[in-house]
Amino acid sequence: EDNEQLLLIIGATAALQALKSDVASGRLINFDMGIPAKVGRAMDCLDNDKWWGEPKAIQAGLTVILPKSAEDEAEGWKALQDATDIGLQTGVRLSHATYASIANMKGREDYLRDSLKRFESIPVATLNSQYTLLNAMAELQVRHIANIYWMKYEGHRAPTENFSKFWDEQEKPSQALNQLLDDL
């Protein structure tokens, strides 16, 4: 039964990616818009805590992509953040990748920055070794999104480390340090 549930999560995540790609292409792919409702209902059958918060992240992602109201969208963003908290506790970063992907797709830099910070704050030593492949896939996706974001503003890919410490947040040398250098 666990394998079936895992396959359901992977399939639902792929469906969310397909929807995201269709929306980003201006509906050129012609993704069947009946699928998101089915995927959302299917996620109700899964234990959110057992599956690292990804079922609720998928549902929240669908809500953010296809909101019924501004309130629903705001609740969707909150649910995405909550899902990453569960991912942090369970050591699987799939919900973090979902959050970053949705934030990137919607052009919400505030949530994108938050998602990258949340992702990078997870110590590698705490990752669940049983799901190394899923964590590696999540890392590739988040790194790709971070690289696109950094290219947009800085003209180069994201740093290998501290990619969530953004250019406008970089620490400036103190005046005292500058004074010491001037005295040389």
PLM regions and their residue ranges:
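Terminal alpha-helical segments
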Residues: 26-27, 52-53, 65-75, 79, ...
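A cross-kingdom marker for long, charged
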Residues: 82-86, 90-184
